[in-house]
């Protein structure tokens, strides 16, 4: 039996479907799905992992013996050697936590244990015990094993860990590696026909990253959390890549705060090419505006003098007309970073982009999405890909045009690697095949691919210099003369700015000028897409980790909004670390560690060397921080309070703050004077931010609430405020009471205490009928009742449009709808799809 180990269950299904001579048989081993099939008479079994099945963790304690030195003690009592520097104290210790008679306890979060934690041995613990059990059961019976996880550092490490589990029960079975870049039949068939050995160096590079990130993340996060400060939430996160990334954002904010705006004046003239003199209506097809040749007047007097000279003028002389054509080259193929940047410009965050891309890859619509490469390999049949996606009517005519123009030639980026090709579509998809968000990203990728096979666009630029009473004005216009790649790839395309046909020496109407005072603006904040590009430029993170790092900064409330703005807490963390341990916040050290991991992958360094260097670097930074813990604590405490501030308490005058319930983790507003002051206000679900504006109705503070998939809305924090009141709406008759012969109404209302909306029976005390409602949107009753449960149908009107629903969560019809959706999705995934792959 040949055992094939994949990274996820979906991959196990796909490979079994693509390789099997007939439909694979779905089975279970200890509750883990596996898929059995035959290839040329041989039994094959695929099993999908759940990503990493082993995870690194510190030993729970360290112990010291004079003869043996330091050792880590695992949970099972096994002893692992530890290299702890002589500068750290040795036993005997007084028995005061975290110290024991002969060592140090590391499991509890204690400040005194952090210097020792840096040097604690790291063991690999089972993360997915059920899957490991199933894997070993199959491995025991296997004649050969194929590791078919994703081909990158992370995938090689996952495969290496899976192999180590297999080797515990089968030490002799031959092992090979399948490398592929897309879930298409030609690609998977080629990969399994050309198996290669495992790459131990690549796995070691992935392992070093996990170990180093564990050490830095655990030590710095514990340090920032253990220095006491007020505020909602407990853990304050930090990490090897996360912290310098935050520092980039904070540094840009410092530049903005230090920026001193300067006044300048802009003069714009109004012209009309349809007349020789003004004034004219100014709204005809040949009317246009042009700025003064001096784009910015730095002195108001100079601008006023220019305005005085053109005052009263009614005509302008066309001094010169220049036309020039320029080529705009077609874009290069997508790698991960450029895809995230382009998707961000279309409103898809980097983290969401990668989630969607992973889904499209697993469903066989695009190639592997975590790549650095920007050059298509010779093995990729470009014409075959074009033919495959031509099934989409939106691309069909353009694909035919490309194929009829001769041999296809693609653009080339600066980065060429041999592991995976750039991201390209592998199968045709239409809006009917995918969700709106998934198709939006697929469409971007497919159009980008076609654009890379297209010619440059030609833009004709026109520059007209106009003379008004001796004052020069300059009008510029751009027109797309030859669309080239722009015919299929409209992203980032500027609207044509067409000027009327003007001849040199002619006279046209001048309709006056305006002078506007403006100020220079500070450097722009980073968008998520721009930040990903900056991280790549500085060597922070990898193509696989950058999106999740940015997402993490939002989760721990270090940043907010997009473009990205640091919170007071985020600024305080960087200020404190930058003052006492600056290397932690600087990109250079992290980038050097990334280069060291590259050298591990190339076999030029060992994992042990790189991890040891990293431990020593962190130990020095922690030694710099420890004496200044009180200062760090004060800075963080003030920042958290500032971020949480909502307004003054109406009862005692102290600060009202955003807080999180320790029990439910839900947000509420409470007074900083608690327990002496018990003022609290409930908050709806969603992202909550304080806003400076007071409620125009009652004068209380307001907050901005962003509910899931909803637009932000500002509301008063006081539930009793008239602005929070909604009229009760009778939506229909209660079906429960009707069965009892009672005529009772169902009423939609908002609870004044919790602010939650629901439909309740006016006879609620006896019948207890209640249906939840969406928290936002106008409620419109209908005269219809649900055919499945008898509940009244209601219409919810939101900014996205009206939608009708049955409010009963337990309605049998909902289960039928979900079943129908699942069947529809399954039919699509099994349906025939034209695919393309490498030769």
Where are these regions (language model features)?
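Intrinsically disordered, low-complexity regulatory segments
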Residues: 1-218, 225, 406
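Basic, low-complexity terminal or inter-domain segments flanking catalytic cores
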Residues: 2-3, 165, 221, 258, ...
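C-terminal or mid-to-C-terminal helical accessory/interaction module adjacent to the motor/catalytic core
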Residues: 141, 185-269, 324
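Long, highly charged, low-complexity internal segments
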Residues: 39-47, 51-124, 233-358, 362, ...
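A short structural micro-motif
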Residues: 362-363, 556
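Helical mechanochemical/support elements of P-loop NTPase systems and associated helical scaffolds
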Residues: 11, 124-138, 154-162, 184-188, ...
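Short glycine-centered, acidic/aromatic-flanked micro-motifs in structured strand/loop junctions
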Residues: 149-151, 341-343, 370
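Short, charge-patterned binding micro-sites
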Residues: 184-186, 367, 373
């Amino acid at each position: 039996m040949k055992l094939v180990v994949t990274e996820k269950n979906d991959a196990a299904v796909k490979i079994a479907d693509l390789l099997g001579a007939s439909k694979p048989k779905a089975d279970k081993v200890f509750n883990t799905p596996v898929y059995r099939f035959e290839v040329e008479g041989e039994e094959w079994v695929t099993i999908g992992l759940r990503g990493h099945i082993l995870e690194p963790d510190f030993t729970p304690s360290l112990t010291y013996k004079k003869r043996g030195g330091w050792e880590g003690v695992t949970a099972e009592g096994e002893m692992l050697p530890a290299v702890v520097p002589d500068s750290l104290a040795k036993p005997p210790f007084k028995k005061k936590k975290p110290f024991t008679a002969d060592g140090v306890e590391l499991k509890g979060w204690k400040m005194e244990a952090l210097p020792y934690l840096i040097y604690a041995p790291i063991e690999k613990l089972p993360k997915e015990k059920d899957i490991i059990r199933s894997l070993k059961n199959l491995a025991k019976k296997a004649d050969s094993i194929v590791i078919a996880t994703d081909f990158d550092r992370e995938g090689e490490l996952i495969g290496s860990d899976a192999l180590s589990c297999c080797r515990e029960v089968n030490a002799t079975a031959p092992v090979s590696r399948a490398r592929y870049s897309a879930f298409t039949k030609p690609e998977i068939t080629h990969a399994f026909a050309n198996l290669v050995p495992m790459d131990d160096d690549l796995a070691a590079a992935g392992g070093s990253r996990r170990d180093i990130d564990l050490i830095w993340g655990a030590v710095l996060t514990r340090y920032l959390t253990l220095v006491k400060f007020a505020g909602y939430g407990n853990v304050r996160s930090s990490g090897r890549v996360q912290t310098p990334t935050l520092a980039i954002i904070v540094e840009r904010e410092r530049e903005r705060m230090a920026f001193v705006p300067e006044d300048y004046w802009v003069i714009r003239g109004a012209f009309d090419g349809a007349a020789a003199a003004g004034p004219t209506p100014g709204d005809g097809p040949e009317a246009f505006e042009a700025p003064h040749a001096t784009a910015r007047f730095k002195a108001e007097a100079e601008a006023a003098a220019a305005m005085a000279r053109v005052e009263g003028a009614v005509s302008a002389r066309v001094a010169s007309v220049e036309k020039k054509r320029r080529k705009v080259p077609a874009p290069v193929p997508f790698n991960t970073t450029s895809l995230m940047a382009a998707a961000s410009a279309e409103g898809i965050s980097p983290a969401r982009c990668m989630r969607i891309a992973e889904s499209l890859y697993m469903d066989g619509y695009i190639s592997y999405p975590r790549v650095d490469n920007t050059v298509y390999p010779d093995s990729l049949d470009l014409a075959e890909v074009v033919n495959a996606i031509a099934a989409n009517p939106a691309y069909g005519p353009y694909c035919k045009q490309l194929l009829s123009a001769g041999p296809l030639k693609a653009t080339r980026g600066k980065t060429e690697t041999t592991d995976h090709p750039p991201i390209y579509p592998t199968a045709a998809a239409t809006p009917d095949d995918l969700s709106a968000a998934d198709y939006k990203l697929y469409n971007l990728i497919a159009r980008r691919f076609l654009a890379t096979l297209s010619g440059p666009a030609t833009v004709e630029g026109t520059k007209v210099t106009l003379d008004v009473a001796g004052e020069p004005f300059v009008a510029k216009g751009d027109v797309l003369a030859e669309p080239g790649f722009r015919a299929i790839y409209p992203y980032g395309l500027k609207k044509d700015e067409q000027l009327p046909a003007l001849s040199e020496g002619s006279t046209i109407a001048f309709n006056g000028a305006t002078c506007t005072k403006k100020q220079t603006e500070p450097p722009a904040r980073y968008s998520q897409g721009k930040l990903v590009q900056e991280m790549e430029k500085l060597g922070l993170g990898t193509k696989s980790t950058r999106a999740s790092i940015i997402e993490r900064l939002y989760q721990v409330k270090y940043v907010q909004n997009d473009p990205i703005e640091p919170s007071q807490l985020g600024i305080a963390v960087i200020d404190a670390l930058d003052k006492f341990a600056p290397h932690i916040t600087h990109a250079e050290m992290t980038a050097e560690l990334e280069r060291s991991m590259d050298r591990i992958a190339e076999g030029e360094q060992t994992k042990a060397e790189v991890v040891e260097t990293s431990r020593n670097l962190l130990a020095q930074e922690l030694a710099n921080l420890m004496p200044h813990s009180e200062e760090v604590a004060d800075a963080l405490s003030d920042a958290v309070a500032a971020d949480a501030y909502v307004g003054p308490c109406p009862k005692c005058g102290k600060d009202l703050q955003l807080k999180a319930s320790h029990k439910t983790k839900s947000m509420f507003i409470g007074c900083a004077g608690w327990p002496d002051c018990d003022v609290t206000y409930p908050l709806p679900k969603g992202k909550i931010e304080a806003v400076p504006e007071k409620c125009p109705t009652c004068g209380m503070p307001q907050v901005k609430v962003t509910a899931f998939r909803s637009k932000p809305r500002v509301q008063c924090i006081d539930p009793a405020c008239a602005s929070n009141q909604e009229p009760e709406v009778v939506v229909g008759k209660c079906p429960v009471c009707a069965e009892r012969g009672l005529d009772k109404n169902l009423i939609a209302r908002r609870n004044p205490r919790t602010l939650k909306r629901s439909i309740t029976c006016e006879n609620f005390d006896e019948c207890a009928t209640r249906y939840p409602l969406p928290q936002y949107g106008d409620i419109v009753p209908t005269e219809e009742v649900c055919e499945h449960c008898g509940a009244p149908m209601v219409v919810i009107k939101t900014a996205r449009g009206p939608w009708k629903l049955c409010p009963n969560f337990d309605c049998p019809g909902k289960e039928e709808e979900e079943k129908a959706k699942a069947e529809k999705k399954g039919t699509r995934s099994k349906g025939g799809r034209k695919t393309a792959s490498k030769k």
